């Protein structure tokens, strides 16, 4: 079922839903550059104001997945993981989720990390990995080879979502969060079935979990720190939307549930990718402090999401062991060394 740009805009003005098949049509038009930048900006603003529905987000993510340059990774999916965030929490923390992937891979997860450069923070996943010497924009078969060899592959979002070029200028000029901010974590080009996803607003916890359910995901934890972080927080309770065995459960977790001391997260902020790199290396070198503790917490949740442990508590204990033993740092070094062969 097709819908014109004008009809879609009117629907948002009236605070009425754009139905799934209509949203498929609309997104295909937008991504093909068939709708003008002015109308694209108006429509995505209208969607934001009326609040995007689960059906609208699912349809938009489906189109982005259709158009993505995919990465095919053979082998079992049970421990195949992405750790990703929407960004936009305004905290400017170091790259917690990127640090977490090295702990997860050291535990035996296969990680297909999907991300880009910073939009709203001081250092995006691509920025800190580049600072570490990682080559961005590998071909799909090279990403797959890296996952097979090291347990980690990084998919640089612009290399896999070329159709986004048709909305890039609009997003940049608008400078506000739109539906595209929440689509990135839903559109992993390797179709990792297990995802630890941080979000920037509490309403998105249940929404993103239900979108992932409709998209056929296996095990997903969507998290929002009550202090505003799009991570599992050390400074407050964290809202969780968990998809497991086809069912969704929403609950809260607290650092002290797992024997972790609550710590303020203000001193986790960085001003640059180089600073984030230094913090990441400090964590993986087992330097004590809140940065290490928040990675242990998030990595524990990641191990649970990847079905490597039966509970978050066990995952946290395992994550601490992997950092203290040097296994997580060794995994980082292995990934960088393997990646250099493509330079």
From Swiss-Prot:
Assigned protein family: Belongs to the anthranilate phosphoribosyltransferase family.
Keyword S-adenosyl-L-methionine in record: no
Single GO BP term: L-tryptophan biosynthetic process
Binding annotation for anthranilate 1: 85
Function (record text): Catalyzes the transfer of the phosphoribosyl group of 5-phosphorylribose-1-pyrophosphate (PRPP) to anthranilate to yield N-(5'-phosphoribosyl)-anthranilate (PRA).
Complex and partners: Homodimer.
Keywords: Amino-acid biosynthesis, Aromatic amino acid biosynthesis, Glycosyltransferase, Magnesium, Metal-binding, Transferase, Tryptophan biosynthesis
Cystine residue pairs: none
Protein name listed in UniProt: Anthranilate phosphoribosyltransferase
Note accompanying the cofactor annotation: Binds 2 magnesium ions per monomer.
Cofactor: Mg(2+)
Enzyme Commission code(s) on record: 2.4.2.18
Record pathway: Amino-acid biosynthesis; L-tryptophan biosynthesis; L-tryptophan from chorismate: step 2/5
Residues binding anthranilate 2, per UniProt: 171
A GO cellular-component term linked to this record: cytosol
Stored SUPFAM superfamilies: Nucleoside phosphorylase/phosphoribosyltransferase catalytic domain, Nucleoside phosphorylase/phosphoribosyltransferase N-terminal domain
Binding site for Mg(2+) 2: 230-231
Positions with a binding annotation for 5-phospho-alpha-D-ribose 1-diphosphate: 85, 88-89, 93, 95-98, 113-121, 125
Residue sites binding Mg(2+) 1 per the record: 97, 231
One Pfam family matching this protein: Glycos_trans_3N
Any one GO molecular function term: magnesium ion binding
Catalysed reaction, written as an equation: N-(5-phospho-beta-D-ribosyl)anthranilate + diphosphate = 5-phospho-alpha-D-ribose 1-diphosphate + anthranilate
